[in-house]
Structure formats: structure tokens, C-alpha cells
């Protein structure tokens, strides 16, 4: 890359590196709070509610958050949201240090922090568009995927180690320190060009503008709906995986960590691949094909295998292409959506593409506990089912993996017939 391009990417590298550290700190706190709450309650439902509280504002309020992003200064929006979220974390630390921290405190604080993230995220997306040259979109998408991958690998390892060594307070302190670095980087070193404020519409009208754009751009909307189905299946998979690995004679909680880490490593490799791969001839096709490969291989391998090595291989195959898909989708969105509309359109995308995640988590758990496991228990003497899925607890989860594999394959093939009429090539 030449010096001119490097100079243009200076602001991005500062923003990316400092925000990545802040994301790692936040993820560590979330993981440590899960450990702390489970120790206090012994309830999986209470810890799951932490995620629900932080995720609900993201799904419900995203459309309006995007409208606010397009109305206000991007840097100020990010700084205010990050600061308020950090204050929430500080409140948790104070309550913890004074032995006053209660479960409902965490739920309320998580909901407010989730709301701040809902507003901050589209502002951050638009900022990336404004400070990055158009021909570098694929590269920065790969780096953003790399961040998400590294955070998913590192945060449970670092948080659990620090939590065991010195407690919840030290994890929160690291999080607050990472916030300070991110705040200084954004406030003092990042120059974000602001778009002229031409519109004087209400926030509701601005939100409707995002929906109108999606209605007029069927390629973008079709991709979003396609990926909402992918997220439904992937989140059901996430709910099924622990029930598949932990009861297995060769599994257990430690093996679940290894298998999960294999997915994170695969995403790191995929993110590196994105940064060096050439521009594809048709990015829409890449989005479709990568998901067909991911959903059409991983679940089948897991359904019919009993060896941890094969589980890890399945995770690698299933996740290594996810950053490739994300990068190509990101380039399509950044180049297709006008900058002055990106905040509200990204927010609409967040609502439509991600609302299926909590639904998938719920359905996956219900299917395993109430359908698949009881079915396998009542057919434990069936030689065919035992040969295919094993026996005992966990065999129902293996059956669920097959169901998810079939559902994922059918979803990709059905939507493939829709997506084939759309093509996107960089100009």
C-alpha cells in the first residue's frame, strides 16, 4: 500500500485499534458479570437475561437510533454514548465494592448500556465510511472482522483468568482503562468530516427514510432478510452446541471451550484472508455461496461425528468464511447507501437482520430439551438412530444438528434463487 493511502487510513487505524481495545474490555466485563451472577444464583436463566436486557434495546430502538445518528455530529454521538456506557460500568464497580450489587442492578444497567450501544453502533459505521477511502472498504471490513474474532477468542480466556486471580473489580478496572484510551484516541486524534445538515425532518420521518430506502433497494433488503434467516439458524446452533458437547463421553466443559475457540481461530484466519484476497467479480454471489458452505457442512459433520477433532474441523469449516461474507456485505452496503442515509439504513438493517437471534436461541433450547432429547430417549433401542446420532444425553442435540443442517441448506438454496438475479461488482 502506498504512503498516500496509509496517510488517508491514519484516522482509521487509530480509531480501530483504540475501539478494539475498548470492545475487548467491555466483552471481558460482560463475561465476568456472567460468572459472578451464576455464582450468586446458580441459574442459567438469570445469566441469559443479562444478554436479553442488553440486546432488547438494540432490536427495538435501532431504527430510531439510526435517525439520531444521521441528525447529530458523529464524533459527539460516539463520545457521549461511550461515556454514558462507561459510567454504567463505573456504577457496577461502586456497587460491587460496597457489597450492594444486586441482580436487578445488572439488568437495568445492561439495558441502558445496550441502548447506548444501539445509538453508538450506527454512528461508528458511518464514521468508518467517512474516514476510509472507497478502495479500502474491503480491507477495513477484514480488520473489523479480525477484531470481532480476536475478542471472541481472548475475552473468555482473559476475563476468567483475571476474575479467578483478583475478582470482578479488576476486570471492570481493565474495562474502564480501555475506555479511557478509546476516548482519548477519538476525542484527540480522529478527524471526522461532517456531512452538511440539509434535512429538517423529525426523527420519526428520518427513521421512515431508512425503511423507504430499503423498499427502493431490493438487493440490499433481500440480502438483509437472507442473513436474518442465517442468524436464526446460527443462534439455534449456538444454543444446541453446549448440549451436544458437554454430555458427550469425549466432551465436557473444557472440550466445549476448545471447540468454541476453534471457531474463533477460524474467524481470525478468515479475517486475515479478507485483507489480502482480491476483489470478487460478484459480491452478492460471495455472500450466498459462503453461507451455503458454512451452513451446509458444519452441522452435518457435527450431527454424525463423535470425535473432538472432527468437531473442531467442523467449526473451522463453518466459521472461516463468515468474515469473507461480512466483508463483502459491508462493501455492498457502504457503496450502495448514500452517506447521509447510512445511519438510519444501518439501524434498520440491525433490526431486520438481528431480531432473529433471540428467537433462534429460544427455539434451539426448546427443540433440544422438549423435542429432540425426548425423541431419542424414547427410541434408544433403534439401531439406525443410535448409529447416526449416538445414544444417551446429547444424542438429541446431534439430531438437532441434522435438522439445522437441513434447514440451513434449504434456506440458502431457496434464497439463492432470489439472490441470483442481483449482482454487485466494484466500479
Where are these regions (language model features)?
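C-terminal transmembrane bundle of multi-pass solute transporters/carriers
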Residues: 60, 71, 77, 208, ...
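Helix-loop junctions on the cytosolic side of multi-pass membrane transporters
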Residues: 99, 126, 130, 172-202, ...
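Substrate-agnostic recognition of the 12-TM MFS/MFS-like secondary transporter fold
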Residues: 13-31, 51-69, 73-88, 105-164, ...
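MFS-fold secondary transporters
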Residues: 38, 91-96, 113, 186, ...
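Small-residue hotspots at the loop-to-helix junctions and early N-terminal turns
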Residues: 29-32, 36, 41-48, 142, ...
